[in-house]
Amino acid sequence: MADFTHFNEQGRAKMVDVGEKPVTVRTAVAAGRVLVNRTTFDLIKNGGMKKGDVLTVAQIAGVMGAKRTPDLIPMCHPILIDGIDLELSLDEERLSVEIQASVSCGGRTGVEMEALTAVSTAALTVYD
């Protein structure tokens, strides 16, 4: 099991030590899509959902999700996020909500999981 980075010699889970890695600028982009029916699409587009402005709430939820990534994903390092840009848009042709997150930091490990968590949380919020 020594070939796997998240397991020690005894096969037990461990968090990888990134202390010796240099601090560099890290950026990750993730995207997702939530498909909806015509009625739901029109309600989202026209602000008619009972829960309010779906896109704004989902955008905030995505940012919050990115910030909570190490609480959700085992062995994910807590990092100091420098920025999160989350964009949600409506695609009339696909009847979908398009979601894209860009996350950046200066650190020793990447921000891919934070970008993916931002998109996932935003998508779940749209669906809710």
Language model features with spans:
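C-terminal binding/interaction regions
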Residues: 1-55, 60-77, 82-128
